[in-house]
Regions:
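Multi-bladed beta-propeller domains
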Residues: 195-212, 238-256, 282-300, 326-342, ...
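Short beta-strand->alpha-helix linker/helix-N-cap micro-motif
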Residues: 44-104, 114, 118
Length: 440
């Protein structure tokens, strides 16, 4: 039986991930401002990976006098990646200037050691330094130093974690990247930009009407989103640096589910301007939309392949929501998902190897991961209301929304599902995450 197409007005009563799909079927804005209530995130890491690098992160000299505990932030970042296991340092503080006795750390089964210092300068800024040691080979792997204002202390810790991650794994770290997400507290919705661990949240938009589908531009300079402040879905682009926004799509009917092309020149979105919900290409500068799909069904939730050659999307053309792909210019449509009767919310890994999506199994909505080379997929969560998956820019982690203990929260997971970190705020529900790109 062909599924009934819901009324777009029902969007307000739906949870985030399904909300995006249903929107396809159918405030005030200012410069980013830090909001302390939502900066108080709690990160809880659980699970044990099959292979983890043991690292000792000594307390940084002067860390006790710093408003931010640099060593603790670095350790939390590395543990959240799923690739590192912290070795007990017994409260030792070691700075970057002297060579440590590495035999002590070998006895503690550490493969590497991070030391450092935090110094407050006379002008109020901070000098943050670190040094990384290969305990097994007895080698100095180099260090980093930053002279920064107090407000950038957390960023310096994330950059140190990036440095350690890249030195020890050979891949870029993602800890200094940003995520966007939406919160609902009482009747108000907020769009936020935050550090990758959810801290340092800054408000981009607040509205009494729903905000959905935030999508980072390839450079991280802009954030597209859908706002219902005009009592219908309208797509805007928010400039992260200036806080200004501009209209991208306000055609007749619904305008939803924006997705940036990898070159940043255009977006693909779902419009109902000609009746049914179809995919259209829209110039990044705004302007006339070009229709890409020509079906009598519902086509929505577009996502570009990282090489820009394909657009993955959700369609009910086969009788139930499934994931398809087509050429970036339209045409040559082929089905991607065949297991399960309800598959939505496609997200492509930046390395092009993986497709994350939400599959309904019985009455549960679960995050699945497909190996695009093999066409095989597995469920990687034990929750039952998963939504809105988005890959980290190094393709090693996925952030998604789910429901736990009666609230919507954000989780990150490794691709094997072994290590998860739960990000919860002080109040309200957190939904619609999108992980930003590497900073350029």
């Amino acid at each position: 039986m062909h599924p009934k197409k819901p009324d777009p007005s029902s969007i307000q009563s739906l949870s985030a991930g399904r909300r995006s799909f249903i929107a396809g079927l159918t405030g005030s804005l200012g410069v980013l401002a830090v909001q302390p209530a939502w900066a108080q995130f709690r990160v809880e890491v659980s699970g044990v990976g099959l292979t983890q690098l043991p690292i000792a992160i000594a307390g940084f000299r002067g860390d006790a006098q710093s408003p931010q505990k640099i060593a603790a932030i670095v350790q939390a970042d590395l543990e959240r990646s799923g690739q590192f296991r912290a070795v007990d340092t017994a409260g030792q503080n070691l700075d970057e200037n002297s060579r440590p006795d590495l035999s002590v750390w070998r006895q503690r089964a550490a493969d590497s050691l991070l030391t450092g210092s935090v110094t407050r300068l006379a002008d109020g800024r901070f000098d943050v330094r670190c040094r990384l040691w290969d305990v097994v080979r007895g080698q100095d792997l180099g260090g980093q130093s930053y002279v920064i204002p107090q407000g950038d202390l957390r960023l310096s810790a994330h950059r140190i974690a990036d440095f350690v991650y890249e030195k020890l794994t050979g891949e870029k770290g993602i800890f200094s990247t940003r995520i966007a997400y939406v919160t609902k507290v009482g009747p108000r919705y907020n769009l936020w930009v935050a550090d990758s661990d959810g801290e340092g949240a800054q408000s981009a938009l607040t509205s009494p009407e729903p905000i959905i589908s935030p999508a980072w531009s390839p450079t991280g300079a802009q954030l597209a989103y859908v706002s219902f402040e005009s009592r219908k879905p309208v797509i805007y682009a928010h400039d992260v640096a200036s806080g200004k926004r501009r209209l991208l799509a306000n055609f007749r009917g619904s305008n939803s589910a924006p997705a940036w092309a990898p070159n940043g020149n255009q977006l693909v979105a779902t419009l109902s301007r000609d009746g049914g919900s179809q995919l259209y290409a829209i110039p990044a500068t705004g302007g006339e939309a070009r229709r890409l799909t020509q079906s009598a069904s519902i086509d929505t939730e577009p996502a570009f392949s990282p090489d820009g050659k394909y657009v993955y999307f959700v369609s009910d053309r086969g009788g139930s929501p499934q994931i398809y792909r087509m050429g970036a210019g339209g045409g040559n449509v082929e089905r991607v998902t065949f297991t399960g009767s309800y598959n939505i919310s496609p997200a492509l890994s930046p390395d092009g190897r993986w497709l994350a999506y939400i599959s309904r199994i019985g009455g549960a909505f679960k995050l699945h991961l497909m190996d695009l080379g093999k066409g095989t997929a597995i469920s990687i969560t034990d929750t039952s209301a998963d939504e809105s998956p988005s890959f980290a820019p190094n393709s090693r982690l996925i952030v998604y929304a789910t429901q736990q203990q009666g609230r919507e929260a954000l989780l990150t997971t490794t691709l094997d599902g072994k290590i998860k970190a739960r990000l919860t705020g002080a109040a309200g529900d957190i939904r619609e995450p999108d992980w930003g790109p590497f900073q350029r």
